[in-house]
Amino acid sequence: MNSLIADPSAHAPAARENLAPVPFGPAPLAEGEVACAYDELLLRISCAVRPADIFEEIWVRDIVDLTWEALRLRRLAAGLMTVGARRALELDLRPLVGFDQARGMARGWAAREPMAVGEVAEHLAANGIAMENLAAKGLGLELDSIERVDRMTMAAEARRNAALREIDRHRTTLARRLRAAVAEAEADAAEEGEAS
């Protein structure tokens, strides 16, 4: 389903039905990302926009790729928050249980292993450490990376929004040309009617 339009005849004039699909290359998937989720996003955006020509097809692919990138970066930022919380947890557990046990408990907690989660909750409660404080400390530990990812997310969203504006501008220009052509045809028809 990596072609841009699932059914070109539903979206394009009959004259374009026999054109080969434009090769945009494979989906820009990172390790662990699911191709069918990307394809679903591509299909839904294509159906919403209904690209009318090759330029709009290119912009739709850009919009999908940039939306996918922004979603990936948001997941990355959430992952960095988890990494930061794990690091903060390990630092807070070291004086309580020792270096090796703190590392193991923090890894298990980050992996959401039930036994590790329970042990961590007990140690935190017994020592008056709130999870919110660990999250804040973890944010501080990863703040530079999270800020960079946030800037990258904003840049991807800005590029996506620019592509959306290009489609709108392209359609406005096309509509203006079509109106002018209709007006010219009507004027020609009126002149022919007066001449006869």
Tell what function each PLM region has:
Residues M1-S196:
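Intrinsically disordered, low-complexity, charged/polar segments
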